[in-house]
Design a protein with these regions (language model features):
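Gly/Pro/Ser/Thr-rich low-complexity, intrinsically disordered segments predominantly at protein N-termini
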Residues: 1-214
Length: 214
């Protein structure tokens, strides 16, 4: 699932994916941004400069996150490596693959999780359908703490995504919080940190040792 353009995630995930607005080496945009007259929509994400910020749309409103620190990208890579090593044939583990949530209360939302796991025989849409998504993972930073703890899990739950992981950096070892979808939204199932491994069965059997991500 290789992305050829920062604003259009595609169904290939063999190498690191550019986030919305993340610059390719040597690239630049100089034309002014044309603001929409109404709500923001997915095509508007193509208008932004590739300056390292992450641009997402929530219910037609624009949300912008500052460029992530290097340790964040290192953690994303470590989580992807763990999930790919355990993935059964046919599953896709993607970093920064867009998800379009266009149902329920959250109609008109385009989100970019740090890590996305897609089920076999996924639709292949430019923006993934939540029905194809088995797991989303967010790596929390100081700038995205409230966003990753409150708003984005609510939207993922409204889209029907069954599993959500949140990873915090921690002073010694990352901490993994594992959530599963219940009747009222996501509920905490397990929390792990340090060198004590845990075994999870969602999205597929996988052994996690958070200290290995440090």
């Amino acid at each position: 699932m290789q992305s050829e353009y920062a604003g259009t995630p595609r169904l290939r995930c063999r190498r690191r994916r550019l986030s919305h607005g993340e610059a390719r080496p040597g690239s630049a945009r100089t034309r002014p941004l044309d603001r929409p007259e109404g709500v923001w929509t997915e095509p508007d994400l193509h208008l932004f400069p590739q300056d390292g910020h992450r641009y997402e749309i929530v219910d037609g409103s624009l949300f912008v996150a500052p460029p992530a620190p290097r340790w964040h990208d290192d953690l994303v890579g470590a989580v992807v490596t763990t999930l790919r090593a355990a993935a059964p044939p046919g599953w896709w583990v993607c970093d920064r693959l867009g998800v379009a949530i266009n149902q329920g209360v959250s109609a008109g939302s385009n989100l970019v999780p740090d890590v996305t796991v897609l089920r076999p025989r996924s639709s292949g849409a430019t923006w993934s359908d939540p029905a194809d998504v088995a797991l989303v993972v967010e790596i929390e930073t100081p700038a995205t703490r409230r966003y990753d703890r409150m708003l984005k899990p609510t939207l993922y739950a409204e889209g029907g995504i069954r599993a959500y992981w949140r990873v915090e950096r921690g002073p010694v070892s990352p901490t993994l919080s594992v959530y599963e979808l219940g009747p009222g939204g996501f509920r905490l199932r397990e929390r792990a940190e340090g060198a004590e491994p845990i075994k999870l069965d969602t999205p597929y059997p996988v052994r996690i040792m958070p200290s290995a991500w440090a």
